[in-house]
Amino acid sequence: MADLDAVLKCWGAVEADFNTVGGLVLARLFKDHPETQKLFPKFAGITGDIAGNAAVAAHGATVLKKLGELLKAKGNHAAIIKPLANSHAKQHKIPINNFKLITEALAHVLHEKAGLDAAGQTALRNVMGIVIADLEANYKELGFTG
């Protein structure tokens, strides 16, 4: 619970500007792992200022709002995880490793924009590790090994 509290302490900076932070997180993900951009067909041709692209920022905001919902559930997130896993496995076909990659992008952006220190970044990785493990368990139930 201490890890979750550490992450939630800086979450206000995310909520203050979901679009900007979301755009930065996805831009960081695509920069560090260019292959991930191909998983988002509507972003495939976007180059240049990815973070400033309205569609990328809007999708990043959607991702962060859902993550905020998961965080605020404080571990009681089965009802949130199940449909998320279902859509990401069946519809979007997102390999589980990509959730680890976006966690690293988020840690980097939160360090820069919200002052998340090394301990906070470790807390974020720990919290996301639990979320990702639960997503992966749902993926397995669905027979998705991506």
Curated annotation (Swiss-Prot):
It catalyses: Fe(III)-heme b-[protein] + nitric oxide + H2O = Fe(II)-heme b-[protein] + nitrite + 2 H(+); H2O2 + AH2 = A + 2 H2O. InterPro entries: Globin, Globin-like_sf, Myoglobin. Heme b binds at H88. Residues 2-140 form the Globin domain. It holds the Pfam family Globin. It is found in: Cytoplasm, Sarcoplasm. One of its GO terms (molecular function) is heme binding. Belongs to the globin family. Monomeric heme protein which primary function is to store oxygen and facilitate its diffusion within muscle tissues. Reversibly binds oxygen through a pentacoordinated heme iron and enables its timely and efficient release as needed during periods of heightened demand. Depending on the oxidative conditions of tissues and cells, and in addition to its ability to bind oxygen, it also has a nitrite reductase activity whereby it regulates the production of bioactive nitric oxide. This is Myoglobin. It comes from Katsuwonus pelamis. The gene is mb.
